[in-house]
């Protein structure tokens, strides 16, 4: 018992079912308001929350840290450029899945944008920024960019321009 691997520790020590505030307070032997120093913003979150997905959130954080190191190691590796791009794309896709499913910081628009990117030549795509309506980044081979950008404009942005959500003249601010 007691792994040095944080992901194994998450599986061993945190249940997959959400925790209630009362369960967390019992485990920590302290009231949650005192843990957050009675910060008004934190108290508002505590009052609104009915449960806390500690297993999922911790699994996301530790797996994301592992992916960051994997990304760095891949960039610095002796793999061929093709192998590097494939591996980096896979890491980006894994990151997006984790953000979406474990951390739940995606939204339908980002899910659609990431899917459109992957369907139109991106080796990997993921949300970036704070999530909950942020941006997406896609890994595309230089040769494929000339087809990728028009495809994303057509399959994702066109309907948003037509609805007035995005201004056509601002397109280069959104897609580059």
What are these regions (language model features)?
Residues 1-124, 138-176:
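C-terminal nucleotide
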Residues 125-135:
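Conserved phosphate/anionic-ligand binding catalytic regions in large, soluble enzymes, centered on
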